[in-house]
A protein has these predicted regions:
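Active-site hotspot residues in diverse enzymes, especially metal/ion-binding acidic/histidine motifs
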Residues: 1-293
Length: 293
């Protein structure tokens, strides 16, 4: 990586946070929203191309196709970031930021990085890929800038939905960032659709909890030992208010009772939203504390 002029140390001796801050400043996109990926590419001397990896694997110059669906690649010698053609814009931007992370983080010394759905996932176990994902998210949300703006608004699911397009991020990525970085106790439960009976009503659609994200204060106050649900799956009507008509894109309110692994139960005020693929339930505050069971 080239010298970061505003840094007091060589680029390879900087921490990730220092690299992030100086990269945004020197590329001229600090506090510019959404983060301008073209300025980052230009500053780093990188070119972005779109490929159909199924038919153009020769670009990768790799002896074997990696496991999983290819989404992005960084070719250091050619100074090229390649992304899968046809990807949604938000996913494409995150993939580009992931490859930029490989380019600038000191220990990421490979001449070729090839990334799939697995390595771009928040669940990857590969250390370098976890680091690249974190740096990509920090580029997307400009470090602490997102949190600073979020804290100036109401603690609500609606706040995250409002900020998402401003930062050029998906609703899911924004809700994750919102919950995990908030200074107040809050959490989001993400439900994935299990299946749908075409002969039944939408409220009979079945969902499972895919994952949960919570702020540090939330974990300290309520569920330091983890959250447990009563069952592995539930109906849509159990997530939304059963007394109101709901639709994709509409935020609704409901209450939810959940228990810690120690079986301590809490009833929370929640807000519920669906992007058409998943359902997000934002836990705001406890309504009342029930007796231990």
């Amino acid at each position: 990586m080239q010298k970061l002029h505003t840094a007091n140390k060589a680029a390879d001796s900087l921490g990730a946070d220092e690299i992030l801050e100086t990269l945004l400043v020197e590329a001229g996109t600090a506090r510019e929203l959404p983060t301008n990926e073209h300025k980052l590419l230009s500053f780093l001397g990188l070119e972005q191309l779109s490929f159909d990896f199924m038919h153009e694997l020769s670009f990768l110059d790799t002896p074997a196709k990696p496991e999983g669906e290819l989404r992005a690649a960084l070719h250091m010698a050619e100074r090229v970031i390649a992304t899968q053609s046809g990807m949604a814009e938000q996913r494409k931007r995150f993939s580009m930021f992931h490859e930029i992370a490989h380019c600038v983080l000191p220990e990421h010394q490979s001449k070729l990085f090839v990334d799939t759905d697995q390595t771009l996932s928040m669940w990857t176990r590969i250390r370098l890929e976890r680091e690249a994902n974190k740096f990509a998210a920090d580029l997307l949300f400009q470090g602490k800038l997102f949190t600073e703006q979020a804290l100036g608004l109401e603690t609500s699911l609606t706040t995250a939905l409002t900020l998402a397009p401003k930062f050029g991020a998906s609703y899911e990525a924004t809700l994750r960032r919102y919950a995990e970085t908030h200074v107040l106790p809050c959490a989001v439960i993400v439900y994935d659709k299990v299946g749908r009976n075409e002969e039944s009503y939408v409220e009979d659609d079945e969902y499972r909890v895919q994952y949960t994200v919570s702020s540090v204060p939330f974990r300290k106050l309520y569920f330091s030992g983890g959250v447990s649900m009563d069952s592995d799956s539930c109906k849509a009507r159990d997530i939304y208010s059963p007394h109101e008509v709901w639709s994709v894109g509409r935020v609704m309110e409901n209450e939810l009772v959940i228990a810690s692994q120690g079986k301590e139960k809490w009833r929370f005020e929640t807000e519920v939203f669906s992007n058409g693929y998943k359902v997000f339930q934002f836990l705001k505050r406890p309504v009342k504390r029930s007796a231990r069971s």
